[in-house]
Amino acid sequence: MNKKLIIAAALCLLPGVSFAQAEKKDSTVFTVVKENPITPVKDQNQSGTCWAYSSLGFLESELLRMGKGEHDLCESFLVYHTYMDRADKAIRTHGDVSFSQGGSFYDAIYCLKNYGIVPQDAMPAPGTPYGDSLFNFNQLSNVTTAYVEAIAKSNAKKINPVWKKDLNSMYENYFGKLPEKFTYKGKEYTPQSYAKSLGLN
């Protein structure tokens, strides 16, 4: 009996011991060896565009590192082109290519090389074309995904090329019109000439 009582008492004390260990403070101290400059963190809100924000954030940090000053690159421009390209691939492969909000760093590099890039000021601020203060793709994603899938999985022998104009209009309503030319810091650019001026490769 005494043996059982001692074991029970010991078991009751175990949570107290583990609790005391949990309260131990971590004494690890980190020393900053080199702190790289970064641009402010932006809010993607209700959109699956973390890839666009992180990719352009990295490129903005690279510009700072290269001594090119602070730039605020436009996620809307990148996302617009990426989604249009992805829709084209999904339709050409009859839906065998994923058409979703996600993306990767490669999409940013591809956009930079093929379409250029623009500063944030060259397009409306995220969400403003539809009365929000930030991106909200809940409705956009549902509509565009259904539209692209309907065309991609269609049994039509020939796809009417008007689909691109329709999809382009949907994106224009959410992102604003893609600029052909814009003025930035007193100089006129196209998206391609602006990208070239940044010196990213």
Regions found by a protein language model. Give the residues of each.
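Catalytic-core signature of thiol
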Residues: 22-201
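Bacterial Sec-dependent N-terminal signal peptides
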Residues: 1-23
